[in-house]
Amino acid sequence: MKKKFPEYKGLDLAQVNRDILKIWDKNNTFKRSVRQRNGKGKFIFYEGPPSANGIPGIHHVMARAIKDVVCRYKTQCGYEVKRKAGWDTHGLPVELGVEKALGITKEDIGVKISITDYNNACKKDVMKYTDLWEELTRKMGYWIDMDDPYITYDNRYIETIWWLLKQLYEKGSLYEGY
């Protein structure tokens, strides 16, 4: 015999989500979670950065959910888990989008438009969807420090990568593989 269960029609998951986010905001839950473990073992998480020049999709939600599970697990193990957001700002799609928007080609850079103006247009364009990313981050309850992200076009980031590559080179850890 098939048993019937009544459907609960009063559950508004969107409202539950909003209520939880309000509580987290009011209690500063994310920052308190990190601060309460200050001085314990450290676990630093640098997000493999999304590109802010594209609209976030469901695959980003899935990837971020996995990242968040790892960080929350480490928190439950007693670690002080600092989570650093980042923005990937390099890539051909950014350049092609800016060239199309400006009505120029690669050959026009330095001729019809200065390199500085072109770079500034790319920097502006690549960050155009950060508000959507921040909204998604908040709505999904993904705990990460969005206040001080690393940005791959920032000279500090680039110089750090160069320094790291130099260290690897000097240790003989880099080789040509072709």
Regions of interest found by a model, annotated:
Residues M1-Y178:
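N-terminal, positively charged nucleic-acid-binding surface of large information/translation enzymes
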